[in-house]
Amino acid sequence: MFRSYTARYTKLDSGYMGQLVEWPEVISEGEDIEECRSMLRDALDEMILAYREQGFEIPFV
């Protein structure tokens, strides 16, 4: 099943911060928007893995 999430990016002095609107615990930072987007995808993958291992329900749209 394909899940869709909305990312919100905030410009920081050190680069960008990204956070998923539907799953605010998934958050990351990067020096530029591309790095932030990539890091946010990695954070999402890790969070999904952790939730599955613990038997938690994964939020999705």
Residue ranges, per PLM feature:
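Residue-identity detector for glycine
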Residues: 15-18, 30, 55
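A short, exposed loop/beta-hairpin motif centered on an aromatic-Gly-Thr core
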Residues: 24-35
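Short, charged, surface-exposed hinge/linker loops at domain edges
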Residues: 1-6, 12, 38-61
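Short aromatic-glycine-(Arg/Gly/Cys) micro-motifs in beta-strand/loop hairpins
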Residues: 8-21
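Structural detector for hydrophobic anchor residues on beta-strands
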Residues: 5, 16, 26-28
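Hydrophobic alpha-helix-in-membranes signature
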Residues: 21-23, 58
